[in-house]
Amino acid sequence: MNKKKIIIDCDPGIDDSLAIMLALKSEELEVKGITIVSGNVHAKKGAENALKILKELGRLDIPVYIGDGEPLVRELITAEDTHGCDGLGETYLPKVEKANYKDGAVDFILNSLREEDELSIIAIGPLTNIAKALNKDKETTRKMKELILMGGAFKSFGNCSQVAEFNFWVDPHGAEKVFNELNRKITMVGLDVTRKIVLTPNYIEMLKQFKNPLADLIVKITRFYVDFHWEQERTLGCVINDPLAIAYFIDSSICSGKEYYVDIVTEGKAIGMSLVDEGDFYRKEPNCLVLTEVDAKAFMEMFLTRLLPEHKKDIFNILNNSKYGN
């Protein structure tokens, strides 16, 4: 099998951690490295969390590189209220002692693009590292095969303001630079589709019943997330945004959308808003495939069966039994 080569650029983060799990459990993908950006938590904490997840999966062979830690212009705002003080739902998993992250996320991205053909980036945090790569070496950054990003909103309302999704809101200038300068079609896996990906109480109860170490870890790190979603949105369960970007990259039939020109608001009350030019007001060539529809059941089947293949039969039974109301 010819594996798809990727770098995961992320800010772990509960759902980032679930996305890393899915990527590493998918034989179609070859994860060349994980680069860390500040977002859900500061980059240093995010790097420590990435190592914790890699250790749990027995994949400390994958290098972790940390970015500069600050957005291009705006002061950093993190989301410990959503992800817990440690970024992993206040589980306080033990620090990894036998491995460490390295500095130089931007250089790692650029060197990897110079050395590897057909390398894609899946960016599930703020776009600071990608923007700084463009600042440093635009020609090399444009060599990436695809940029799949979790961020933005089109028809959906925002999750940190009425109109802005968190990743673009944290570093709107970085997002603006990427959309305007990358010169590659971007795929925007935004809130229009990710809001439909909910780890429901039924799924969580199923995971508990498996008595499986990885299932137990998922339950453990999402408990805080579940409480947050109930308190803030009256959602039962938790929305897991980031794994959908991985799933779509593996199987694009899971989502559908349309190409548009997209720009990002960098100031004012709408800061971080993704402006999707549905009416062709700007008369510019599309720079982004904006996903608007998702087969949530197909996603959940992929996500759960890949992470827990030994429980595939039970997972299929739950997914296909309407009485569970998933």
Predicted regions and their residues:
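A residue-level signal for conserved active-site and pocket-lining positions in enzyme catalytic cores
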Residues: 64, 178, 246
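Conformational coupling and interaction surfaces
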Residues: 2-3, 22-23, 30-31, 169-173, ...
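Active-site histidine-anchored catalytic micro-motif
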Residues: 2-10, 14-52, 92-195, 201
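Generic secondary-structure signature for well-ordered alpha-helical cores
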Residues: 55-60, 69, 93, 114, ...
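Short, surface-exposed amphipathic charged segments that create phosphate/polyanion-binding patches used
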Residues: 77-84, 161-165, 203-205
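Short, mixed-charge, low-aromatic patches
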Residues: 3-10, 63-69, 88-89, 129-135, ...
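Metal-dependent C-N hydrolase catalytic cores
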Residues: 4, 47-115, 287-299, 304-308, ...
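Short, mixed-charge aromatic SLiMs
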Residues: 41-45, 72-73, 153-157, 263-280
